[in-house]
């Protein structure tokens, strides 16, 4: 098969079409091969992949391809995590509506329509990166069958008492107007004011307690005061009653060891609900529950004249009133970490209301045990999950006040308040559309649950769904737990944790054997990519110019678990590397016919004797061994070793050293055998190296694989031939490589063509081992460098540096010697080297007078060997080795 002149990234599209047409990556459930199932992260379908997706999918694909080539039956699906607020916001924006303007089911239809469009766009983007997905195994979380599984998982956990409905404080986003889980709260630094306020004693003694708070707008919901029982300043105030300024309710003072004595005044007001600690104190001291802030982030009617105002506006007015009524003692700057919604970054409130929860606290020990059974890559990432488990204070709030999500399959009896859950056989079901049940009290007039499930309730069952849960019981038993979960470190406390909770609750088993954690992508400026910083690079920008394989090489030159800075120069290097190797493959193919390839396939490499061939084959097999070990341990940046070997050892050196054998037209048996061995070695290095590159640059590998008739490119990983690994062979090869490279550099420095002939080269090698190595490969050295006569000597040469030419200083000699000037210049030109050296150092007495260095304009020196002028080249890395070139 002919090879094109230039490598073109346009070929990548044809390769992708071939894979899809031939279903190259289909999971076969082959009994003869062990399964390897990947719990692929389902991205949110925005319609555009970002570079973080490109990094993560490249990691996954490298692992999938490596496992497939090592004999595994790989199930690598693609999923889409469809539900969520961003789609609702986008639908409102595109249609110039709000979700309250139209019927909820029509609004959901618009969300589904937009999501379908975005999924189709992103399918193409995943394909464009050459990801070896089995598209027959695609799952979409908004599709009816997936909703059925998500609702079934809800029912199973409800039946086990692991899901409950209760009135409970929740993290609430006033911008999104929905509850959010503890794991969805992000903390941001903010400078605010710490307000020192007088709380007068109820007995009107004129005395007061001094309380420090950053949220005076919550004072209407103040239901108690707490002090540390060991704080001597307040030993006499426990049990007393104080009045809340501006709002006048009376509250008691309680002792509590959770109070930080050093913060503020050491006196804390307890509100329902300011933060998590308030929740703890309200429950511990059995205090009244008051609601000061509503779902829109506005103050409620208990706040009197401040009711209806946004929290920030109310705070300003209340502070102003506290000052004017002489309750404010002082204000100090306060640095805080404020909880914010992970999507819109709005500061959260804690409000109380009826919500659905997963009782995660019941499962924490099981999750911890499972985490210890799972292999973590890198290992230290497990600590993040363990820390999350340790800090877990609340159950997981799973109900959301939105529309585009999996419906909670529940109704409420209007008469007795009974909760009625759907039957498994009726799933999927939307209770706002259907009400097929009657309460046990006889009432059929049921109220539908309008809240929906948190989207993590969908994505946290992915390993179950991928392994065939609720589809094929035998398949599921055989394939669950799955082998691998790849994901980012930013969602360990959400996706990883929730998946473990759900899997353990439903099956009692861990979800996967291993979890591989990748980092995030940063811009060239060192900051996280964001539109506001202007440092975003999209995968399409890269692939359009450099191709998918260049992007994949950039991603591969990183360490799993660490954040990755993007750099255009690395992408450009990847493109140059592919062109370099393409040219090497093209050169080799010009010297290896299709008929010769068939012959080479049957040759045994052990019959090779040429030291240069043995050197590169030893290097190759060492490389195979290292790359195999590295990929087995998820060290994907081992691609650097492949690149160094191919570029520097193979292209820059080996090919140059075997050209003379490939070009040899001699018909002798020995010459033809040498040529065949060179062809075999070229073929072997190219085909084995292409296989090594397949997980990293699959398009390039596919194209070269077709040219070189590699039939098992996707199913066979190279095996290192230990017989060919030899330190001695590598030593000999390195000596030859350095000798050839040094003399080639000599030619280049002299402005000579690299293929210029050299009449004679004498090598003097001081080290006996080096001498034997060069001698062993003398023919390759001689013919690679086009040396007519090569002499290799053990020892050091008798070299002398002497003056070879001298130019008299006419401007000095003329005026000084006048009519004898010509004779003086002739004398200087004809003088021997010793005479000139003496003139230069101390001057000499002549018949014309004293001559010294001022009478010489220029001196040229040369190296002499055996009385002849020669040139020399030092041989890199060889001990006291020099080549004398004539």
From Swiss-Prot:
Subcellular location: Cytoplasm
Cellular component terms (Gene Ontology): cytosol
Residue ranges of the motif 'HIGH' region: 43-53
GO terms classed as biological process: valyl-tRNA aminoacylation
Motif 'KMSKS' region per UniProt: ranges: 528-532
Cited InterPro entries: aa-tRNA-synth_I_CS, aa-tRNA-synth_Ia, Anticodon_Ia_Val, M/V/L/I-tRNA-synth_anticd-bd, Rossmann-like_a/b/a_fold, tRNAsynth_Ia_anticodon-bd, Val/Leu/Ile-tRNA-synth_edit, Valine-tRNA_ligase_type_2
Record keywords: Aminoacyl-tRNA synthetase, ATP-binding, Cytoplasm, Ligase, Nucleotide-binding, Protein biosynthesis
Keyword set includes Protein biosynthesis: yes
Classification via CDD domains: Anticodon_Ia_Val, ValRS_core
EC number: 6.1.1.9
Catalytic activity: tRNA(Val) + L-valine + ATP = L-valyl-tRNA(Val) + AMP + diphosphate
GO molecular function, one term: aminoacyl-tRNA deacylase activity
Cited PANTHER family: VALINE--TRNA LIGASE, CHLOROPLASTIC_MITOCHONDRIAL 2, VALYL-TRNA SYNTHETASES
Domain comment, as recorded: ValRS has two distinct active sites: one for aminoacylation and one for editing. The misactivated threonine is translocated from the active site to the editing site.
UniProt function note: Catalyzes the attachment of valine to tRNA(Val). As ValRS can inadvertently accommodate and process structurally similar amino acids such as threonine, to avoid such errors, it has a 'posttransfer' editing activity that hydrolyzes mischarged Thr-tRNA(Val) in a tRNA-dependent manner.
Protein name per Swiss-Prot or TrEMBL: Valine--tRNA ligase
Native source organism of the sequence: Methanococcus maripaludis (strain DSM 14266 / JCM 13030 / NBRC 101832 / S2 / LL)
Biological classification of the source: Archaea, Methanobacteriati, Methanobacteriota, Methanomada group, Methanococci
Gene (name only): valS
């Amino acid at each position: 098969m002919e090879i094109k002149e230039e490598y073109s990234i346009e070929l990548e599209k044809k390769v992708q079409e071939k894979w899809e047409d031939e279903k190259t990556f289909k999971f076969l459930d082959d009994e003869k091969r062990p399964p390897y199932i990947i719990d692929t992260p389902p991205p949110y379908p925005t319609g555009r992949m970002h570079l973080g997706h490109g990094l993560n999918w490249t990691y996954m694909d490298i692992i999938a391809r490596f496992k497939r080539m090592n004999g595994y039956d790989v199930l690598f699906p693609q999923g889409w995590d469809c539900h969520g607020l961003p789609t609702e916001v986008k639908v409102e924006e595109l249609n110039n509506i709000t979700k309250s303007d139209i019927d909820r089911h029509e609004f959901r239809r618009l969300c589904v329509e937009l999501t379908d469009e975005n999924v189709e766009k992103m399918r193409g983007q995943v394909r464009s990166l050459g990801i070896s997905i089995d598209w027959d195994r695609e799952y979409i979380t908004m599709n009816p069958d997936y909703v059925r599984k998500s609702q079934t998982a809800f029912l199973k956990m409800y039946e086990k008492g692991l899901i409950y409905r209760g009135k409970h404080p929740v993290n609430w986003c006033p911008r999104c107007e929905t509850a959010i889980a503890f794991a969805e709260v992000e903390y941001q630094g903010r400078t605010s004011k710490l307000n020192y306020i007088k709380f007068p004693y109820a007995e009107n003694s004129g005395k007061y307690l001094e309380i420090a708070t950053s949220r005076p707008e919550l004072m209407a919901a103040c239901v108690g005061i707490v002090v540390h029982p060991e704080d001597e300043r307040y030993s006499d105030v426990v049990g007393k009653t104080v009045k809340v300024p501006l709002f006048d309710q009376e509250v008691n003072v309680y002792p509590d060891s959770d109070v930080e004595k050093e913060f503020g005044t050491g006196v804390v007001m307890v509100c329902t609900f300011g933060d998590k600690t308030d929740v703890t104190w309200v429950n511990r001291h059995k205090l009244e529950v008051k609601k000061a802030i509503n779902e829109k982030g506005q103050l409620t009617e208990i706040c009197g004249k401040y009711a209806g105002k946004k929290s920030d506006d109310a705070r300003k007015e209340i502070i102003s009133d506290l000052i004017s009524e002489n309750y404010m003692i002082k204000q100090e700057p306060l640095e805080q970490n404020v909880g914010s919604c992970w999507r819109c970054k709005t500061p959260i409130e804690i409000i109380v209301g009826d919500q659905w929860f997963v009782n995660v606290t019941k499962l924490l020990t099981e999750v911890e045990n499972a985490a210890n059974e799972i292999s973590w890559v890198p290992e230290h990432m497990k600590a993040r999950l363990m820390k999350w488990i340790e800090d877990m204070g609340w159950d997981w709030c799973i109900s959301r006040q939105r529309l585009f999500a999996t419906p909670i399959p529940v109704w409420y009896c209007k008469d007795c308040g009974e909760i009625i859950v759907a039957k498994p056989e009726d799933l999927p079901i939307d209770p706002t559309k259907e009400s097929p049940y009657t309460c046990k009290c006889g009432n059929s007039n049921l109220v539908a649950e309008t809240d929906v499930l948190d989207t993590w309730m969908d994505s946290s069952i992915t390993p179950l769904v991928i392994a065939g849960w609720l589809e094929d019981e035998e398949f599921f038993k055989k394939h669950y737990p799955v082998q691998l979960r790849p994901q980012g470190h930013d969602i360990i406390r959400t996706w990883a944790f929730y998946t473990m909770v759900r899997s353990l609750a439903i099956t009692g088993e861990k979800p996967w054997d291993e979890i591989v954690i990748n980092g995030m992508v940063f811009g060239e400026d060192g900051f996280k990519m964001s539109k506001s910083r202007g440092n975003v690079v999209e995968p399409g920008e890269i692939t359009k110019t450099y191709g998918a394989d260049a992007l994949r090489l950039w991603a591969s030159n990183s360490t799993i678990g660490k954040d990755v800075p993007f750099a255009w120069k690395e992408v450009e290097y990847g493109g140059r590397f592919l062109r370099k190797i393409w040219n090497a493959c093209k050169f080799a193919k010009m010297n290896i016919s299709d008929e010769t390839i068939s012959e080479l396939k049957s040759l045994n490499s052990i019959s090779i004797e040429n030291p240069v061939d043995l050197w590169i084959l030893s290097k190759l097999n060492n490389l195979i061994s290292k790359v195999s070990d590295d990929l087995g341990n998820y060290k994907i940046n081992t691609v650097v070793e492949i690149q160094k070997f191919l570029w520097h050892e193979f292209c820059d050196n080996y090919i140059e050293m075997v050209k003379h054998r490939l070009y040899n037209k001699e018909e002798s048996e020995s010459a033809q055998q040498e040529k065949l061995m060179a062809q075999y070695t070229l073929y072997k290095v190219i085909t084995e190296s292409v296989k090594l590159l397949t997980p990293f640059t699959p398009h390039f590998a596919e194209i070269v694989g077709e040219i070189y008739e590699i039939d098992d490119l996707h199913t066979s990983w190279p095996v290192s031939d230990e017989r060919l690994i030899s330190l001695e062979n590598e030593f000999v090869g390195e000596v030859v490589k350095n000798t050839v490279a040094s003399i080639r550099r000599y030619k280049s420095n002299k402005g000579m063509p690299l293929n210029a002939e050299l009449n004679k080269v004498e090598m003097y090698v001081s080290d006996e081992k080096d001498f034997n190595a060069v001698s062993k490969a003398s023919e390759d050295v001689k013919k690679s460098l086009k040396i007519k006569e090569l002499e290799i000597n053990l020892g050091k040469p008798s070299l002398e540096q002497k003056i070879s030419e001298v130019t008299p200083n006419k401007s000095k000699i003329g005026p000084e010697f006048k009519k004898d000037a010509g004779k003086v210049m002739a004398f200087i030109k004809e003088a021997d080297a010793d005479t000139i050296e003496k003139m230069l150092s101390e001057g000499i007495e002549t018949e014309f007078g004293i001559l010294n260095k001022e009478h010489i304009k220029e001196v040229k020196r040369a190296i002499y060997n055996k009385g002849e002028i020669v040139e020399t080249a030092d041989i890199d890395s060889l001990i006291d080795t020099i080549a004398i070139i004539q």
